[in-house]
């Protein structure tokens, strides 16, 4: 399998000299092949990570996705080959899930698509479930991942969709195996019970999802739930509303609610077995860019290998937002110098506790700066450059990590898409 994926990446590299399509996306109902090359560099000092505080990874990702459209308007196939190649890493530094330890890695995927009617769809096999990557049309509660690394979220099992009316969507998924952005050391792995002693999911338990979404031209309200024996029961809601202020200005509000309860073998007598999170964001959009404010509150922190609670709107490369009793608040501005070049400036404040004992208080402040440039014409049309730098500081009186923690983080990404139809 690794040889097959590696050969695909060689083909991707050869294609990088060809003309790129701007914002290339595969349409579900047409045949196509998308090639994505993504070069990423991460260098950081994250003292809250303990022995893994020094972070360095430089990688080249090659991602190939193909889609057949539908034969007789009923059945089709989709698939891909993803690979992350190591360009730079050091044995004495963490690669923070960009690599398999300090090694290259990859995998392939493929699924059969069945369209019983124009308003329904069934997928069987291994398929993408990452809305940021374009695998799903929007952020479906609990089902949709948003990978923070080179490769997107992938699920193995069955996915179903039914447009009940033009405004109401129903989604269901049964997932036996999964790849999340923290699974670089395992690749596609079984869903199941996490063993903190071995760092593996050694008891296989499939996970079932159900979600519904109502939408119109300015709103989307979605609700989803999942059940997984011996792991957790979860529920999530996502509410989005845009208000036109005049032809050139809009106000958008977003609100996320989340609740999780551990079940069976995942329950712990010394730690909280349930948690809740609420987070929201308000964005004012103007011709020159946008101004936004966001906030979030997490009741109890949980092991991210069991329940992912890092899903709120405030964002920082350095500071944790998913600690015990954590509040996080952020203000920011995106300023568009040209239609292609955008600058971002976003300070953040956090308040919470280091553990469920609540004996060490965390008071964090940080600032994020970033720039994004997209090539809009010429042979490199569609190439996207992203650079972000983050500086943070936490006060943790009495912590074994130190009373004052200083953070810095730099992330760079260059992405290039090429489409064949």
Swiss-Prot record:
Induction: In the presence of glucuronides. GO terms for molecular function: porin activity. Residues 1-23 form the signal peptide. GO terms for biological process: monoatomic ion transport. It is found in: Cell outer membrane. InterPro entries: OM_porin_bac, Porin_dom_sf. Keywords: Cell outer membrane, Ion transport, Membrane, Porin, Signal, Sugar transport, Transmembrane, Transmembrane beta strand, Transport. GO terms for cellular component: cell outer membrane; pore complex. The keyword Magnesium does not apply. Enhances the activity of the UidB (GusB) glucuronide transporter, on its own however it has no transport activity. Glucuronide transport does not occur in strain K12 due to a variant at position 100 of the UidB (GusB, AC P0CE44, AC P0CE45) protein. NCBIfam families: PRK11379.1. Belongs to the outer membrane porin (Opr) (TC 1.B.25) family. This is Membrane-associated protein UidC. It comes from Escherichia coli (strain K12). The gene is uidC.
